[in-house]
Structure formats: C-alpha cells, structure tokens
C-alpha cells in the first residue's frame, strides 16, 4: 500500500521541483520564503555563487510576528535592502506555499518598493 504524504512533505517535494526549474532557467538571484506558525523568514540567494546575499526574519520582534502585517513589514525591509544592493529584478520562490496571506503580503510589499519579479 502506498504511503500518504503529509501536507508539509508534499510542500517540500513541490519546493524541490520548483527550485530545480528556477535554477536551470534564470541567472537572477532568488528570494525564497519560509513560514512557521509564529514567524516568517526570507532569504535572497544567488544560485551562481551558491551564497546567501540577504537574510531577514521576524523572530527578533517582541510582539507576535506570524501575521500578515509582520510579513508586509518584512517585505518592505527586504525591498529597501535590495535597493541598497542595487538589485531590482529577482525570481520569487514561494517554496511551495500557496500565494495567499503572508506570502502574498510579503511579495506585494516588495513590489511596492520597486522590486520586479
């Protein structure tokens, strides 16, 4: 009998498929997100150099930071950091998460800062 995948295992498998496609097709840096129940994290990664350029998270906030408002604030911070590093085009990797809620708020906040993807 086939073993059923949990929701998180299915998301991880989807993330690997997406990441492999992105690596093959583009030379742009990749922003990917991770969300836990209480926090939200984002990293800018250069696949050519195999190096993390920028890493941000909401875990250092004293107030609850697992909501849409915190993700939006993090998106504005990430957009501002990308401007200072003169990066205006990226590839957004949502890590297998649905484009809704915190992921959507983060992406739209980065677009408001002028980042194109």
UniProtKB/Swiss-Prot annotation:
An example GO CC term for this entry is: ribosome
Domain of life of the organism encoding this protein: Bacteria
Q: Which residues form the signal peptide?
A: none
Annotated Gene Ontology MF terms?
Answer: 5S rRNA binding; structural constituent of ribosome
Keywords of this entry: Ribonucleoprotein, Ribosomal protein, RNA-binding, rRNA-binding
Stored CDD domains: Ribosomal_L18_L5e (cd00432)
| Any one of the GO BP annotations | translation
Gene3D superfamilies in alphabetical order = 3.30.420.100
Q: Does the keyword Ribosomal protein apply?
A: yes
Q: What Pfam families would the database entry show? A: Ribosomal_L18p (PF00861)
Q: Which InterPro entries match?
A: Ribosomal_uL18_bac-type, Ribosomal_uL18_bac/euk
Family according to the record:
Belongs to the universal ribosomal protein uL18 family.
Spell out the NCBIfam families in the cross-references: L18_bact
HAMAP family reported for this sequence: Ribosomal_uL18_B
What is the role of the protein in this entry? This is one of the proteins that bind and probably mediate the attachment of the 5S RNA into the large ribosomal subunit, where it forms part of the central protuberance.
Known partners and oligomeric status: Part of the 50S ribosomal subunit; part of the 5S rRNA/L5/L18/L25 subcomplex. Contacts the 5S and 23S rRNAs.
* Name of the molecule in the record: Large ribosomal subunit protein uL18
State the organism named in the record: Mycoplasma mobile (strain ATCC 43663 / 163K / NCTC 11711)
Upper lineage = Bacteria, Bacillati, Mycoplasmatota, Mycoplasmoidales, Metamycoplasmataceae
Q: Report which gene this protein is encoded by.
A: rplR
């Amino acid at each position: 009998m086939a073993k059923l995948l949990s929701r998180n295992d299915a998301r991880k498998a989807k993330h690997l498929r997406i990441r492999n496609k992105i690596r093959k097709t583009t030379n742009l840096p990749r922003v990917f997100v991770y969300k836990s129940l209480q926090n939200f994290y984002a990293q800018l990664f250069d696949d050519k150099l195999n190096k993390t350029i920028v890493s941000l998270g909401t875990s250092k906030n004293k107030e609850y930071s697992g909501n849409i408002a915190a993700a939006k604030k993090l998106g504005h911070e990430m957009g501002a950091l990308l401007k200072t590093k003169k990066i205006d085009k990226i590839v957004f990797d949502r890590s297998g998460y649905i484009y809704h809620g915190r992921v959507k708020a983060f992406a739209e906040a980065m677009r408001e800062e002028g980042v194109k993807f």
